[in-house]
Amino acid sequence: MPIYFRNTPVSAPFMFDSIGNHWIEGGTCRPEGYPHYHYLQTESGCGQIEIQGKIYELRENEGFLIAPSIPHSYKKKSDLWINAFATFTGTLEASIPAMLQNRSVIWIEKEQGQQIAAQIATCVDEIAAHGQQDSKFLSLNCYNLLLNFTDCVNGPAHMQ
């Protein structure tokens, strides 16, 4: 279950503050939200996430991108809930809301989730192999991942 946290000052336009996959999740409660955009996706099992007073099931390859400071909590619904995740920062972090049409929550369906999971795995593998030395590569991959969320801004009807 690899997990990486940024260990250098932010100098790139977009950067992962943290990224990981194959993470065994028990649950988290964030009444003040998280300080950065936070993406959470189920790799296997099933979880339950509460955002803005609404409860959703998070099944395999489904995910949520949550804006900073949005209260939320999540917990496992199955015996084992395994996740991929990424949190985003960077010198252009303030431009992310405009990229996402100021949406505070974006639902990711299974098809898009498969692509995002593959991108997260590529980034995790790259960090494992080469560390965080190539900030341009990581920044480019971070931006590429953020672009996936712009494709999902209008999301399914139950999220409108």
Regions found by a protein language model. Name each.
Residues 1-57, 62, 77-78, 103-107:
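Generic protein-terminus/edge-of-domain signal
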Residues 22-25, 90-94, 151:
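Active-site/binding-pocket entry motifs
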Residues 29, 49, 95-96, 157:
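Short acidic, gly/pro-rich beta-turn/loop elements at beta-sheet edges
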Residues 55, 68-92:
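Ligand-binding loop in jelly-roll beta-barrel domains
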Residues 91, 111-160:
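An amphipathic alpha-helical interaction segment
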Residues 91-108:
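Double-stranded beta-helix
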